[in-house]
A protein has these predicted regions:
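Anion-binding alpha/beta catalytic cores of soluble intermediary-metabolism enzymes, centered on
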Residues: 1-31, 50, 55-180, 194-269, ...
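Short, well-structured alpha-helical segments in soluble
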Residues: 36-52, 159
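Conserved catalytic block of serine-dependent lipid acyl chemistry
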Residues: 191
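Flexible, acidic glycine-rich loops studded with aromatic residues
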Residues: 282
Length: 300
């Protein structure tokens, strides 16, 4: 409250609820959720569950957010495993509606069944259509080859099932070399693979930035070249800055859950809240539930 007194805000639109505990980044999420029922993220999840809040936004540890949401917030009927999604910039070679693509899952689950991958595609496509405003978003299954017969039996089954979902604009398999080209709006994968892909992209961006700094110090001609490229480089930083996008949606609950980066700035948290608000206003979770309810199967 003392901190808020330094800022201009409407007290009618902000309620502060004190919590005696919090879950740190280095704690075991599973143990903390059990031993700290009054931790801030658990209290926030319970407020969403009982209708006193419409969405949950947290910059806490991913595990604690996922487990807190699972403890208090109901899943969409038919969804047994939720999934974390995140947007990432593409080259947009195919001039799609959005230069960003959504990857789902990026770590909520290590493995997923073929039917669960189908649900991830439906939830991801619904999110992109409603939140990003992409018309008929194209979804693709991350695999080791483009052909329908590529990959494990599970991936082949997922491919066949995805083709049969009327609400999906499924384009087939996509290989790792193509995910930055912008061939699809939604990339579906298991969490183990998705997490490695996203962190590899983050590491590549960091390496490119480091190489640019080395070049800037190495030669005057290179420094001059970077000077003329500064506007373009600034634009690249903007589209790769996680603060611009707020956070990663945790898909599969009846209420929207947004997981912000642990190092989120004020701008990132603000954008995460705006993202949650837009999701609520556009009834994203309700639309996901409707589309999943239209399926002829239930996940095992």
């Amino acid at each position: 409250k003392d901190e808020l007194k330094q800022h201009d805000y409407s007290s009618d639109s902000l309620e502060i609820i004190h919590t005696p505990d919090s879950i740190s980044m280095d704690e075991s999420p599973k143990e903390a959720v059990v031993n700290k029922p009054n931790a801030s993220v658990l209290v926030a999840a319970s407020l969403v569950s009982n209708g006193k809040a419409d969405a949950l936004v947290s910059a806490g540890s991913t595990g604690s957010v996922v487990l807190s949401a699972a403890k208090h917030i109901s899943r969409i009927p038919g969804v047994k495993r939720t999934a974390i999604a995140t947007v990432y910039p593409t080259l947009n070679e195919f001039k799609r509606d959005d230069h960003l693509a959504l990857m789902v899952d990026i770590g909520a689950n290590v493995e997923s069944s073929a039917k669960e991958l189908v649900l991830f595609a439906i939830m991801g496509s619904t999110y992109v259509a409603n939140v990003r405003g992409v018309g008929s978003p194209k979804s693709a299954l991350l695999n080791i080859g483009e052909e329908e017969t590529k990959g494990s039996e599970k991936m082949q089954t997922a491919y066949r099932m995805l083709k049969e979902v009327p609400s999906l604009n499924f384009s087939g398999n996509i290989e790792g070399k193509d995910i930055l080209r912008g061939m699809a709006d939604v990339i579906v994968t298991e969490g183990f693979v998705g997490n490695i892909v996203i962190k590899t992209l983050e590491g590549t961006a960091m390496a490119a930035s480091h190489l640019g700094k080395l070049a800037f110090r190495a030669r005057f001609s290179w420094k001059l070249g970077l000077f003329f490229l500064r506007k373009g480089l600034r634009r690249i930083r903007e589209v790769t800055d996680y603060a611009e996008y707020g956070g990663a949606p945790l898909l599969g609950f009846e209420k929207m859950v947004i997981i912000a980066h642990g190092r989120s700035s004020a701008k990132a948290v603000s954008n995460a809240i705006k993202l949650a608000g837009k999701s609520v206003r556009d009834k994203v979770c309700e639309t996901m539930a409707q589309k999943i309810g239209e399926l002829d199967f239930q996940p095992k």
